[in-house]
């Protein structure tokens, strides 16, 4: 265990839900996966933990961990998804704060609780190389031999006309086609809209014959528990034949995240998905959101979606790769427990695909 540097301190499980959301919105890198609602729905209230790091009494970093333990032995994992959060909204981010918060996380979950700690920080391959050094110096190694997933991030600080001009020619043409049709946009955060979207989403999944990457019903439950200012944005597009497309986006910090998209069978020719994305960008611009994360690309396994997102991002879109997951552990029992649990989960997943 390494003490935090002078002036820094940490607190664990000392905040309630309302205070957590107040702190969450102070960080530019705040996101859906660090919301209380997400952790509670995914793991249950007893299986989430909240850590604060302070400098001279002022909160400068936070992290929500999801805790999974093996029965009887008490060993297991603490997982920080898209965290910790350490980039303030109104000030310049300091890499030293990142160092202190991952040290505090390791002290609590590895040294005190004997768990395997795995973090998935919002760091990309084009960020400063200092972060890899900090992770290594603080006792973290890359989780397995995995390479981080890719995504495209749009800079929304540019004028709207520049963003439109940056769209690739194919995307611009499809958007113009959609704008000439009599399409109606319905938007909000209500459960009724979520229900309509799910019906369309399930229809698309059945048509394309692919396995859902995320449990959308779980996200509906999360939506019901999120406070108003953190709820997901739902946008639906209606043509003369009914609902033709929809999307769900999350905006908690300075980056909007595209979570789900769907197109109905009857809406295949409406180009509604193009219109929705553009209307969403207009809405994000009005809210002064700085970035739009198109949330995952894979040219090999999903070339169609990759092309859609690449053309939307245009020439100015950042095609980036996450640094990946990093972990630290001092307990052989926790390492073994997590390894067995993940193997069983992988086997179960393979059986479901057959």
Predicted regions and their residues:
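A conserved beta-strand-loop-helix scaffold within acyl/acetyltransferase catalytic domains
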Residues: 6-56, 60-74, 121-126, 131-149, ...
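Glycine-rich, N-terminal phosphate-binding loop and its surrounding beta-alpha-beta segment
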Residues: 59, 63, 75-123, 127
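Conserved beta-strand-loop-alpha-helix junction that forms the acyl-donor binding cleft
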Residues: 119-129, 294-303
């Amino acid at each position: 265990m390494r003490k935090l540097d002078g002036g820094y301190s940490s607190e664990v499980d000392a905040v309630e839900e309302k205070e957590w959301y107040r702190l969450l919105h102070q960080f530019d890198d705040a996101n859906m996966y660090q919301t209380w609602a997400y952790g509670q729905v995914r793991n249950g209230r007893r299986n989430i933990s909240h850590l604060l790091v302070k400098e001279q009494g002022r909160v400068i970093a936070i992290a929500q961990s999801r805790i999974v333990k093996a029965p009887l032995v008490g060993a297991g994992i603490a997982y920080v998804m898209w965290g910790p959060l350490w980039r303030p909204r109104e000030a310049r981010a300091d890499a030293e704060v990142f160092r202190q918060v991952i040290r505090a996380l390791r002290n609590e979950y590895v040294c005190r609780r004997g768990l395997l700690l795995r973090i998935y920080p919002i760091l990309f391959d084009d960020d400063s190389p200092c972060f890899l050094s900090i992770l290594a110096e603080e006792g973290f190694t890359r989780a397995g031999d995995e390479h981080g997933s890719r995504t495209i991030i749009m800079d929304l600080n540019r004028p709207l006309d520049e963003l439109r001009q940056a769209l690739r020619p194919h995307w611009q043409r499809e958007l113009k086609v959609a704008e000439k049709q009599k399409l109606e946009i319905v938007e909000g955060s209500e459960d009724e809209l979520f229900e309509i979207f799910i019906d369309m989403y399930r229809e698309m999944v059945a048509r394309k014959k692919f396995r859902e990457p995320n449990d959308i019903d779980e996200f509906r439950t999360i939506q019901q528990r999120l406070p108003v200012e953190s709820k997901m944005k739902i946008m639906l597009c209606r043509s003369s034949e009914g609902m033709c497309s929809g999307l769900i986006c999350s905006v908690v910090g300075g980056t909007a995240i595209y979570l789900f998209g769907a197109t109905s069978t009857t809406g295949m020719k409406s180009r509604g998905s193009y219109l929705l994305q553009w209307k969403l960008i207009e809405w994000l611009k009005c809210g002064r959101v700085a970035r739009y994360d198109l949330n995952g690309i894979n040219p090999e396994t999903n070339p169609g979606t990759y092309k859609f997102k690449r053309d939307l991002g245009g020439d100015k879109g950042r095609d980036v790769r996450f640094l990946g997951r990093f972990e630290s552990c001092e307990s052989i029992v926790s390492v073994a427990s997590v390894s067995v649990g993940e193997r069983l989960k992988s086997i179960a997943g393979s059986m479901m695909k057959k």
